Amino acid sequence: MCFTSQENLMKGLDESGLKVSLVNKDNPNLHKNAPWQHIEVSSSTTPGLKSSSLGRSMNRWLASHENYSNCVAIIDWRLIKYLHATLSNKSIPWILLDRSPPADKGLLAKLQWPVWKKSWRLVSKTSHSRGSVVSPSHGKFVQDFVSISDEKIFTLPAGVDLEKFTPNKKTGEINLIYHGRLDRHRGVLALPMLVSKARAKGIEVRLTLIGEGDCANQLRLIADSDESIAVYSQMPQDQLATHLQKATIGLLPMPNWNIWSISSPLKRGEYCASGLLIYGIDHDGHRFTDNKKGWMKLVPQHDFHDEAIKWFSSLAEDEIQKYSQQSRKYAEDNLSWQLSVDGLLSAIHELKS
């Protein structure tokens, strides 16, 4: 789980009156002033061994402590196989946290798929357990691979910090932004080409890219020769929020592949909370439940550039401001982390009842 999701869910659980303990490999200084208890355990830094090393360290810690019997464990899918026996022996109910099946390409992802399936089979066969998914389509995806009842699965969507991510007044300028992994398989290399094609049609746009990934250096080289493109390394949330405030349109270029079509991207909510219009590829992972929104335009992948140029050229300044307000309002009504926390609390109380 990314730190943003972890922090907001734990904060919500703490504010609800529950005692929260976090067991992971983080440096204790990261949680020095946090309201939850943090327990650091060791983990290997060798690729391919990180999860097994961390899982075994967590299991040793759990096996040696007796004062955690009256609790519910929330565990990432990569780790549950190392902890399942000890949790069962101690009669500790647990929730599987699945924020995404294996998302990387290559050998590592191939090795992770059997682990992911086994994790969900453990949910299916263990009486005092539930599994969380980020979207209904994610839940259906799980059921395509594992025989598991609807009652064992609940949706825990990504939320957004509405106080950290806030809008600024928009102008008529078209400032595009994408933040997240700058990986080739996420479609980000199509974004500089969008700037070039828009410019060829007489539309001035600027593009900001924030993150790291396997094509980050290639994107930086492109930006070096195009002053309308800026590439930044991954940054703290406060700095990210400032960049989002300056933008007009948030981009969702991830293609219509299984891994993206079942997702609930954090950036989508952060775009909305910042009052951005949204443009991206049309699939379930990018859509909201009600997809008919003037401030959000999703198109087939093969039309990504042409439809963007048509939309950008049609946007007047007053329309951008109106859509910005509607986008923020949607975030306030539908995307607060509290909604996710409430869903998690409900699952916890059901397991303890």
Model-found features: residue ranges?
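Membrane-proximal helix-turn-helix segments that form the acceptor-binding/catalytic region
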Residues: 96, 102, 111-134, 145
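A charged, aromatic-enriched C-terminal amphipathic alpha-helix characteristic of glycosyltransferases
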Residues: 303, 316-349
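Conserved donor-binding/catalytic core segment of Leloir-type glycosyltransferases
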Residues: 132, 169-195, 208
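Nucleotide-activated donor-binding/catalytic signature segment of Leloir-type glycosyltransferases, i.e.
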Residues: 217-241
